[in-house]
Amino acid sequence: MSFPYFISPEQAMRERSELARKGIARGKSVVALAFAGGVLFVAENPSRSLQKISELYDRVGFAAAGKFNEFDNLRRGGIQFADTRGYAYDRRDVTGRQLANVYAQTLGTIFTEQAKPYEVELCVAEVAHYGETKAPELYRITYDGSIADEPHFVVMGGTTEPITTALKNTYTENADLPDALDIAVEALRAGSAENSSNDQPVLGVASLEAAILDANKPRRAFRRLTRSTLETLLQERDSKESAESEEPIESEEGKKTGKKSDADSSD
């Protein structure tokens, strides 16, 4: 007599979690962080058409890591939900927390009821309405529907440990856009170096996708950063660093010159 194959619920959940985590880890990394002007998204993404970062509504942005077809389906569903609610009630009634809760419920249902969980991790970010001073909100939603409110930054996809470590060491609150971009790019490079061999090139602007939620814009806060803009911002940061490094040298030379002149005058 043959017995039907049985698997305990705990083992089934463990196997689903392992499947989802491995799928997310195979993807490229994404960083979202708060800065002085709003929220910055930076993703390792060489594709120009398959985008990981998107606008959900006026003041709400979206970023994801994992399987593109799965998180793109969630992205489109979030946009439809936001548009419907904003039309039926008021545009201010659409919030980042509300959309994050919808995504958490959807992913939780998929994880427990469907045969295969979604191999995705999401970030929903919101900036305050124009004229308000509320801090940006960042929400992380994982494959099983878990949701967390992150105060400063979110790291998803790929090898997250070196990127998170780099951000903990370099992140500063209320940084300007060039500084925030440099922090995010250097953190992504730390994760890329962890996975690549020595002969592979350093992660460049051509392999990056970036956008911001600009809290200083009156209505639609989302704005993509082109690759030329990225290059300009990073060069601005480099020139700022070089100027700061030259200042102490000049002051020391000035001190030496001043001492010399005093000695000459005494003679």
UniProtKB/Swiss-Prot annotation:
It is found in: Cytoplasm. Residues 234-243, 252-267 have a biased composition (Basic and acidic residues). The keyword Cytoplasm applies. One of its GO terms (cellular component) is cytoplasm. Residues 231-267 are annotated as: Disordered. Signal peptide: none annotated. One of its GO terms (biological process) is modification-dependent protein catabolic process. One of its GO terms (molecular function) is threonine-type endopeptidase activity. The formation of the proteasomal ATPase ARC-20S proteasome complex, likely via the docking of the C-termini of ARC into the intersubunit pockets in the alpha-rings, may trigger opening of the gate for substrate entry. Interconversion between the open-gate and close-gate conformations leads to a dynamic regulation of the 20S proteasome proteolysis activity. Pfam families: Proteasome. PROSITE patterns: PROTEASOME_ALPHA_2. Its main location: cytoplasm. Pathway: Protein degradation; proteasomal Pup-dependent pathway. Keywords: Cytoplasm, Proteasome. InterPro entries: Ntn_hydrolases_N, Proteasome_alpha, Proteasome_alpha-type, Proteasome_asu_bac, Proteasome_sua/b. The 20S proteasome core is composed of 14 alpha and 14 beta subunits that assemble into four stacked heptameric rings, resulting in a barrel-shaped structure. The two inner rings, each composed of seven catalytic beta subunits, are sandwiched by two outer rings, each composed of seven alpha subunits. The catalytic chamber with the active sites is on the inside of the barrel. Has a gated structure, the ends of the cylinder being occluded by the N-termini of the alpha-subunits. Is capped by the proteasome-associated ATPase, ARC. HAMAP family: Proteasome_A_B. Belongs to the peptidase T1A family. Component of the proteasome core, a large protease complex with broad specificity involved in protein degradation. This is Proteasome subunit alpha. The lineage of its organism: Bacteria, Bacillati, Actinomycetota, Actinomycetes, Mycobacteriales. The gene is prcA.
